[in-house]
């Protein structure tokens, strides 16, 4: 395969050399592609639009030994709303980063392409953070990392309670009894029962019905942190854009009236504080 066509999204774009950009593309047919767009940083470059983050375009690519080369590009969608709203932009950046870290070049994932493409549109009509969390849970589920959110990941009993331990190492939520059993107690984050219920809906529900869901500021912060923690621990990689976005979430009061910054902390399974 010398020259080939690919309809792809730009999920990462960074400077490369004096006037080039190194693009990470994600296509339905080929999965992730690393390609150099030569000369696109020059003001008069005709291919400049095709090297912008989140652009969806038809690319004519030349296959190289380590990096492909963009020969021609025909932009189809630029998602302009992502550049006019900070929350939308940060959610899209977080999703693109997760997709990049969770996949390898040359492995097609048509379902993930559809999920990503749809989610970039959806942030305009739904809470961007809600779309971001849904995207993370569905992506991880597709890759085989479905968290157990109904039954205890350790004993299989249905979980109940106002505060539950969410442990990626265990594979999901852990009941009170299993939290302290054994020589190595489960490690994770405490999640409220309400947030856990919403996480179930995000994982199992349809994207088209996402705008029907509502969450408060406390649930937003809690689920964003739990989603990031789950992805990072499972993939063993750091999500930098997620950390930045979480810091910008406006912290309110949790349902008990206590400041949620004082309530949220890592735990070792021996207690909530």
From Swiss-Prot:
Family to which this protein belongs: Belongs to the RecO family.
GO CC terms in record: bacterial nucleoid
Region feature Disordered, mapped onto this chain: 250-273
Bias (Basic and acidic residues): 257-273
Primary gene name: recO
PANTHER family the record matches: DNA REPAIR PROTEIN RECO
Keyword Magnesium carried by entry: no
Keyword DNA repair: yes
GO BP: any one term: DNA recombination
Organism field: Desulfitobacterium hafniense (strain Y51)
Keyword tags: DNA damage, DNA recombination, DNA repair
Protein purpose: Involved in DNA repair and RecF pathway recombination.
Annotated Pfam families: RecO_C, RecO_N
Stated name of the protein: DNA repair protein RecO
InterPro entries: ARFGAP/RecO, DNA_rep/recomb_RecO_N, NA-bd_OB-fold, RecO, RecO_C
């Amino acid at each position: 395969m010398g020259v080939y066509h690919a309809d792809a999204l730009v999920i990462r774009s960074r400077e490369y050399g004096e006037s080039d950009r190194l693009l990470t593309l994600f296509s339905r047919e080929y999965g992730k592609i690393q390609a150099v767009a030569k000369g696109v940083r020059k003001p008069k470059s005709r291919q400049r639009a095709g090297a912008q983050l989140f652009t969806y375009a038809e690319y004519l690519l030349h296959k190289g030994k380590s990096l492909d080369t963009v020969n021609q590009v025909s932009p189809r969608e630029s998602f302009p709303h992502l550049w006019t709203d900070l929350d939308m932009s940060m959610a899209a950046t977080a999703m693109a980063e997760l997709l990049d870290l969770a996949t390898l070049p040359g492995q097609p994932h048509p379902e993930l392409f559809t999920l990503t493409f749809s989610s970039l549109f959806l942030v305009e009509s739904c809470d961007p953070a809600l779309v971001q969390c849904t995207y993370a849970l569905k992506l991880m589920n597709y890759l085989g990392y479905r968290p157990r959110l109904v039954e205890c990941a350790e004993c299989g009993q249905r979980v109940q309670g106002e505060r539950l331990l969410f442990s990626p190492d265990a594979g999901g939520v852990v009941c009170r009894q299993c939290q302290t059993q054994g020589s190595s107690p489960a490690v994770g984050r405490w999640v409220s029962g309400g947030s856990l219920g919403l996480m179930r809906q995000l994982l199992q529900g349809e994207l088209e019905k996402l705008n029907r869901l509502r969450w408060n500021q406390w649930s937003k912060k809690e689920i964003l942190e739990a989603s990031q923690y789950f992805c990072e621990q499972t993939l063993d990689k750091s999500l930098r854009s997620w950390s930045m976005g979480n810091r910008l979430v406006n912290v309110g009061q949790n349902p008990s009236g206590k400041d949620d910054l004082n309530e949220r902390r890592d735990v070792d399974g021996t207690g909530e504080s």
